[in-house]
């Protein structure tokens, strides 16, 4: 029943594997570190959906946002966070890519590069300013790691591994791969907050669209 409401099946024809995602996935900037099983899950899902290499970066950025913002939420709750992120990408008030939307906020330059006046701009290192981002996990000062398994023993952390797989899968669907389309269950929301933790001052100026799990969605 849930898939009929949130995930609409699409027709995919002639899909054939073109190589391992583990081989195709190149180095790129993203916010979180992935444990070995988190990487394996990512590669498995990219392979299954036959996602072209050029789409990997945006998929990972969205998947990380879903995971850190809604790890403990249901599939419906995770899809809702994905939809808010997508709605922002499609809204001219926000940047036009998933990575830019997720990482939006003021930055500061690292002292390591700031001390070199003649260093080219593309070689400078910047970090987000603490607690100044659109999505709090990205600049809360904590090290972001997707712990799908324990570091020493390698044992799977079932809840985290499942949440990461769901986040990756939803992100793949949002990007038009994997055979399902993610319908907007937030009714066009571009804001949300965790109502069990906080009531933000800006909420009084926004319109409520829906409540899903521990998040209130607004536009």
What are these regions (language model features)?
Residues 5-13:
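Sec-dependent N-terminal signal peptides
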Residues 14-18:
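N-terminal signal peptide c-region/cleavage motif recognized by signal peptidases
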Residues 22-219:
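Bacterial extracytoplasmic/cell-wall-associated proteins, especially those involved in peptidoglycan
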């Amino acid at each position: 029943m849930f898939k009929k409401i949130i995930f609409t099946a699409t027709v995919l024809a002639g899909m054939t594997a073109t190589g391992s995602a583990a081989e195709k996935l190149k180095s790129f900037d993203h916010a979180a570190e992935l444990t070995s099983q988190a990487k394996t899950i990512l590669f498995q899902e990219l392979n299954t959906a036959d996602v072209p290499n050029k789409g990997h970066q945006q998929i990972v950025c969205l998947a990380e946002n879903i995971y850190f913002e809604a790890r403990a939420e249901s599939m419906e709750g995770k899809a809702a966070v994905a939809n808010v992120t997508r709605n922002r990408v499609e809204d001219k008030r926000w940047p036009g890519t998933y990575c830019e939307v997720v990482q939006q906020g003021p930055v500061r330059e690292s002292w390591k590069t700031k001390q070199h006046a003649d260093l080219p701009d593309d070689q400078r290192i910047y970090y987000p300013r603490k607690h100044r981002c659109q999505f709090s996990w990205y600049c809360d000062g904590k090290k972001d790691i997707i712990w799908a398994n324990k570091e020493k023993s390698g044992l799977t952390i079932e809840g985290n591994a499942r949440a990461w797989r769901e986040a990756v899968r939803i992100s793949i669907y949002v990007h038009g791969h994997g055979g399902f389309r993610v319908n907007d269950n937030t009714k066009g929301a571009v804001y949300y907050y965790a109502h069990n933790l906080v009531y933000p001052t800006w909420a009084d100026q926004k319109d409520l669209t829906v409540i899903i799990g521990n998040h209130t969605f607004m536009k």
